[in-house]
Amino acid sequence: MNRRHLFAWLFRHLSLNGHLQCHVHRHSHQLTQIPLDTRLWVFRRNRNHTVHRLLNKNCSRRYCHQDTSMLWKHKALQKYMEDLNKEYQTLDHCLHHISASEGDRRSLTRRHAELAPLAVIYKEIQEAEQAIEELESMCKSLNKQDEKQLQELALEERQTIAQKINMLYSELFQSLLPKEKYDKNDVILEVTSGRTTGGDICQQFTREIFDMYQNYSSYKHWRFELLNYTPADYGGLHHAAARISGDNVYKHLKYEGGIHRVQRIPEVGLSSRMQRIHTGTMSVIVLPHPDEVDVKVDPKDLRIDTFRAKGAGGQHVNTTDSAVRLVHIPTGLVVECQQERSQIKNKEIALRVLRARLYQQIIEKDKCQQRSARKLQVGTRAQSERIRTYNFTQDRVTDHRIAYEVRNIKEFLCGEKCLDQLIQRLLQSADEEAITEFLDENLKSVK
């Protein structure tokens, strides 16, 4: 009798698994999909007690929550989801059984559509958890030796359902995350070399980092438009700027802004004569590119200076006043451009960069108003923060915000898979922190 019931149960819930899989595929367009490792959920209050190291070649250390199921069982989250589900059921009933004015119906329909993905996932999590409870109950009655095969089959099925549940947990948590309204923006990327004794090491490193982002843009099929480029001796780079356009550019590059440090024995330049390890820095600034409607610059607020271009560049250098300097009087921001031969084009580029910097100030002000007292795990997001070290002598890149290490610097500087993996980890860490923020701030009233 037990055997017959178990076979019937397994058949029914194998169908359930297929339904779960179809559901995730069917609703994937409604939710932001970011691959998540369920072992890496951060819980701030445990950050100084539990350390986890991923078991792969390029290991990453971080503080973590033990399991998504523990996060799901958080009383505040359970209460929050129960209330949302009740609200969804009420709205569903109203839309189907109660007459309302056109304006009220439109408002109800909009809210109903917002809650629908959450309600469906919540229901399927409950069904899957109930399925596991039924399976475990049946397994307890299978103690005979001749039913060992059925026990193994049941345990295998339990593991499959548990994996589906974890997938649904991740999908639910993703749907709860606040969406960054600037993620789809294009960006203005600026790089500037630092200063050291024999500063050629910083200038060479700046060129390598700029080339890395140009290669990454090609890897992601983005458009890379050079705005400014000031070369240095020995193939180095003083300063450069570019506009990068494409899908979700700011989302992927927003955590690249900050101080990048290099440790190496220089191969060229004055510093190479000493044959010892030198340390240098360069800075990266990532500015979301605004539309003209987002930032309006009053011509009365600008002071425009023209001067002769410097450096290599052809006959126009040091002969015509083609270079342009814009000073935004209210904020004191200064932007220069001498990339083009035409003064008009240089003015257009400088104005574009100025708008981006003003837009960044608006964004930072907005974030300061929304941000809690606790800093994000991925850092303060300040452009002056040291975020990463490139140690050439040890062939290692370390991101200090998430204690992420990767070997093979040359491959990393190619700006392809290795860099993309690190960027995905940074996005993942930000999402983990956002979930913690959500629980601590929005659900703290629930006991």
From Swiss-Prot:
Entry comment on modification after translation: Methylation of glutamine in the GGQ triplet by HEMK1 is conserved from bacteria to mammals.
Gene3D superfamilies associated with the record: 3.30.160.20, 3.30.70.1660, 6.10.140.1950
Biological-process GO terms, alphabetical: mitochondrial translational termination
Record's function text: Mitochondrial peptide chain release factor that directs the termination of translation in response to the peptide chain non-canonical stop codons AGG and AGA. Non-canonical termination codons AGG and AGA are found at the end of MT-CO1/COX1 and MT-ND6/ND6 open reading frames, respectively.
Name of the protein: Peptide chain release factor 1, mitochondrial
Residues recorded as bearing N5-methylglutamine in the entry: Q315
Transit peptide: 1-63
